[in-house]
Structures are given as C-alpha cells and as structure tokens.
A protein has these predicted regions:
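Fe(II)/2-oxoglutarate oxygenase catalytic core
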Residues: 1-189
Length: 189
C-alpha cells in the first residue's frame, strides 16, 4: 500500500514482461477508439480521452485468466466475471500523446469542475452497480509522461511494465470518494 487514506496500492512485477507482451499481442488487432461518456452519451472521440481499447473476457482468454488469478492471489478479491463481481478486462493503448482527463471510475462520467453530474441512474446502475475498486496492470513502461496522477493526495505513479496499481473508488458509506479523482498524463515516448 502506498497510501492508506484513500487506499491506493502498488504491486511490483505482478506479471512478467512476457505476459504483458502476450496481452498486448492478443489485443492489438482488435482495438477500437475508446468511447467516452460525455453528458450521458458515449462519444467515440473526445479531447478528454485519446486512446484505443479492446475488451477481453477473462473466461475466454487464457492469458487474461492467468492475470486474473494473480490479482486474486495478491488481493483475495473475487474477480469471477459475473454480473456483480468484475467487468471484462480493458486493454488500453494511449500511444504517444494519449491521455485521459480527470475523472472518477465509480461514476463512469466526465468530471466538470471537480464534480460529477451522476445522479445514480446511469448505465452503471443498470448493469449491477458501481466500480468499487480499480485494478490497473501496466503492460508497458513509459520513458516520459504517462503517469497516473491523483491530484488531491498529490501523487502520481509512473507506468512500469508488469506493475499493478489499485485504488478504492467508493467510501465506507458507498459514496463516491472524490479524493480518488485521477487522470492519465500524456505519454511522450
């Protein structure tokens, strides 16, 4: 754990460089422009997020199953891909200059002036609820830029191949924890 309140943790070398390469290879040909939720509508391109994504079902891809097992061993969290357990893996590629603006993962919506417009009736509610925990495994190291930054606690984590960053999006009362607002800085190299 690198921060206790709000809880943010980092595992070094959770997966091997070869496992990271395998995941990237599987995803590369299936990536699409990442949709971004702006005002309750998904847009395929936004100045708020520039990336490509591929959704990977851990039950169908042996490499994803292996990563899921490692996450379970490290955290004891049940990642069974069921309605109320976890989402499909999201393999993201931000590329050079790619970024994501400040947001909360638990709302699934853009943050304007530090607040969310989510009233609890979003798509999240329709598919079983909020994302309580985010677990991000870095599949590449980045020489310049690319850090995941948390402005309120004033910290950023540089991507390192195989490391895994996690944080809790919701507070003890099942409320959005605004201290976990975060962004992905532009990658330069």
């Amino acid at each position: 754990m690198i921060l206790k309140e709000p809880e943010i943790g980092l595992f070094h070398q959770l997966i091997t460089p070869q496992e990271a390469e395998n995941m990237k290879h599987l995803a590369r040909s299936k990536m699409i422009s990442t949709p971004y939720n702006v005002g309750g509508k998904n847009e395929l391109f936004s100045k708020l997020r520039t990336s490509k994504i591929m959704y990977m079902n851990e039950n169908l891809v042996k490499e994803a199953m292996a990563v899921s097992r490692k996450i379970h061993w490290a955290t004891r969290m049940n990642l069974a891909n069921e309605r109320f357990a976890s989402e499909n893996f999201q393999v993201m590629n931000y590329g050079i200059g790619g970024k994501i603006s400040i947001h909360l993962d638990s709302t699934g919506e853009v943050i304007e002036n530090g607040t969310s417009s989510n009233d609890g009736t979003s798509e999240w509610s329709k598919i079983g609820g909020q994302r309580f925990v985010t677990f991000m495994v870095y599949l590449s190291s980045v020489e310049a830029g690319g850090a995941t930054a948390f402005p309120q606690p004033g910290m950023s984590i540089k991507p390192e191949i195989g490391s895994a960053l996690y944080w809790f999006n919701m507070g003890a009362q099942n409320n959005f924890d605004s201290r976990i607002l975060h962004l992905g800085n532009q990658s330069y190299i």
